[in-house]
A protein has these predicted regions:
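RNA pseudouridine synthases
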Residues: 103, 115-122, 141
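ATP-dependent small-molecule kinase phosphotransfer cores
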Residues: 44-108
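Glycine-rich phosphate-binding P-loop
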Residues: 11-24
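Pre-Walker A (Motif I) flank of P-loop NTPase domains
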Residues: 4-13, 107
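Short beta-strand-centered segment that lines the nucleotide-binding/catalytic pocket of NTP-utilizing
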Residues: 33-44
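Conserved phosphate-donor/acceptor-positioning beta-strand/loop module used by diverse small-molecule
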Residues: 122-145, 150-158
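Small-molecule kinase domains that catalyze NTP-dependent phosphoryl transfer to phosphate-bearing small molecules
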Residues: 59-70, 74, 149-193
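NTP-dependent small-molecule kinase module
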Residues: 97-101, 170-213
């Protein structure tokens, strides 16, 4: 099969599952860009909100303020009074939402996290993936990568996953990591990073071929 793709590939991931690294390998194979924290920079540039605020609120859970009001205000754009009065975490989410759609409109790419699968749920070219791994595998990876004890690594994993799940569940009204909400779920602990990337590449190529029928 060709090593090109016409798809936008979104990757949700458990912390320590190496979803970002796998996404980078997939992007490298197809010769397309991989956006992870780069999404924050694009959103900051487009919205005029400083990048540090995006980093502070990145995939952090929110509270108060009804989701429906956020999305109602979204339809009026950044210049509306409603947007100006909105809490900063909601401004951040909507700016990222727009940046994701804008980058997807520029062509095939890989997007990691930040509810990209939800932002592009109505795009026929979007292929959504969730990468997970057993907790003990992730503990070893994080402990080795950051020089932490197993207990410290476990605490960081639990904290980060809880934050990502709360953020995703709040803004999408779906359940983070639920298999039925993704086109493909893959265990990077069982397969290893290289094989996980290969499985994703094969799946995307099959998806691309199905669109031509």
């Amino acid at each position: 099969m060709s090593n090109t793709t016409s798809s936008i590939i979104t990757i949700g991931r458990e912390y320590g599952s190496s979803g970002r690294q796998i996404g980078q390998e997939v992007a490298k194979y197809f010769g397309i860009k991989c956006y992870d924290k780069e999404l924050l920079e694009h959103a900051a540039n487009d919205s005029g909100i400083c990048k540090e605020l995006f980093e502070h609120h990145d995939e952090k859970p929110t509270n108060s303020f009804l989701y429906s009001l956020v999305m109602d205000t979204y339809s009026f754009g950044y210049s509306s009074a409603g947007f100006n009065d909105m809490p900063m975490n909601h401004k951040i989410f909507l700016a990222q939402f727009d940046a994701i759609k804008k980058l997807a409109g520029e062509g095939p790419c890989v997007m990691v996290g930040r509810c990209a699968d939800y932002a592009l749920s109505d795009w026929p070219d979007c292929f959504s993936i969730f990468v997970h791994a057993d907790l003990d595998v992730r503990i070893r990876r994080i402990a080795s990568k950051y020089g932490k004890s197993d207990r410290e690594a476990k605490d960081l994993i639990n904290k980060t996953d809880k934050s990502r799940a709360s953020y995703y569940n709040y803004y999408t009204n779906k359940k983070w990591g639920s298999a039925k909400d993704y086109n493909l779920c893959i265990d990077s602990g069982k397969l290893g990073l290289d094989n996980a990337a290969k499985v994703i590449i094969d799946a995307v190529q099959i998806f691309d071929a199905s669109k031509k029928k």
